[in-house]
């Protein structure tokens, strides 16, 4: 750590923190919305929590997959900034918004057709089925604004104004909490919607966020100069470039997040209390995931700019720095979680049996968080290098070729019950961290040879 005295090192720490800390604030707000959905639904009843959980677990892989594709705007803009080609940024954002509209139509139509029979096939209790279905319907009103926000936020963040994005999301958070309270518990003369109200509240909040981002990029400098809200005629090679980078990113994220949804489907057979405990522990773990995710997004920006400027040593320096900081912070929150497991469980439920289950699930969550502290930042680094195919194949291997089969084996062969799938998630995340680390080492060696 003696090199911290070096001015260049200090400057890099300062720059990375200036990008990352507001992203953490934004992630806190985003995860806070999920937290309010889960915790308030849980206070309305176990069936409300279970129904909202099932709906959320279905929505999560869908939204992260398509939003992941749209996040291609971030490395594209970062590379253009580094290369001094700012005039091309507007086209990237406009094409992202065009794709956002197309994705929204696809998801809404697909949901109307396939969601009811899919939920029926899960053998849910009637009340849980009803809540899950209408939670998704309520959330559906916010699908379009959710995806339109992604390229706009990518512009704001990549230009270095991550603090502005943070302020927008933090402003929306209390609105979401109030809407949850009013709609879930039936206040201000409105009917009591229970877990369904959480979906409606989140959908409305997405519209509020879109309005705020649209005002920012159209009225404030330096965003106004890019004129990103106008219509664009799709250019074939630009759409192809966007999808070339975005699809592997989105599918890789889908592979990672959908495994949690699939696990929830297998856990559903163990009953409402187990579903509620699983969702409570998973929801809190998602809150913690904001730290490695924030490192991932920040490293995509700083590494992408350095790589676009052909400053390869700078990109390597940010890589090492980001991983060191991520692991250090992970050690702190993992120890705190271990000590505070019971208090965490009490946030979500007062059911003694559910509390005991949550405490065990959190132990398994702590194990995979160590792997996430390595895997998530490396994914962001690789995206900064525009090396997106590696994250796809690593996710496919770790989660679907290893994690899911191991979970099924531990459940059906060794009778480990619901814990089997959490044990397999630990194995999957650790495998992902190892494989991604190897890929990063090989990539940087190849770039170094190119320099020579």
Where are the language model's segments positioned?
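Short alpha-helical transmembrane segments in multi-pass integral membrane proteins
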Residues: 1-20, 77-142, 190-247, 303-368, ...
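N-terminal transmembrane alpha-helices
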Residues: 7-39, 43-44, 57-72, 76, ...
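Transmembrane helical elements of multi-pass membrane transporters/channels
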Residues: 18-37, 138, 172, 205-209, ...
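Helix-terminus/linker motif at the lipid-water interface of multi-pass membrane proteins
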Residues: 28, 32-50, 119-126, 182-193, ...
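Interfacial/gating helices of multi-pass transporter permease domains
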Residues: 41-60, 92, 126-131, 195-196, ...
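Small-residue-rich hydrophobic transmembrane alpha-helices
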Residues: 49-112, 146-165, 264, 277-341, ...
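Short runs within selected transmembrane alpha-helices of multi-pass transporters and secretion channels
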Residues: 70, 139-157, 165-176, 198-214, ...
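Structural signal for membrane-spanning alpha-helices in multi-pass inner-membrane proteins
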Residues: 111, 154, 180, 184, ...
